[in-house]
Amino acid sequence: MLRIVLAVIAGYLAMAVLVFATFTGAYLAMGTEGAFRPGSFDVSTLWIVVSVILSFIAALAGGWVCTLVGRRRAAAVALAAVVVVLGLAVAAMEFTHSGEQVPAARSGEISNFDAMQMAQQPTWLTLLNPFLGAAGVLLGARFRKAE
């Protein structure tokens, strides 16, 4: 049981580190104007596509790491459940606090930190992310098993 708990933690940390690193790199590569729609904090279509791809890759890696540490598929299933539960909890918080502290208009360049805080993504993406993440985790676990 302890191995599964440690595997879930390791897999989740791998996902978090990859998401932070790749999203930071993507934002720096795209710049403010590439990541957001003109004059707003609504994310651009390009950002949506890139973020879905990067999130799925991070989930694959998380599932792979989780299975490496846990040595059983049960660890990846537990991580997938954690991803869905936490993802839906974050979505619920976003819906209850939607747009409270985000200025309506954006002008000029903004820092990576401010971009993370103020980005407004579509509702459908907020709801899709937990399930896409869980699918990536389970598929990543299968990659580990195939080796």
Predicted regions and their residues:
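Juxtamembrane/disordered regions of integral membrane proteins
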Residues: 1-147
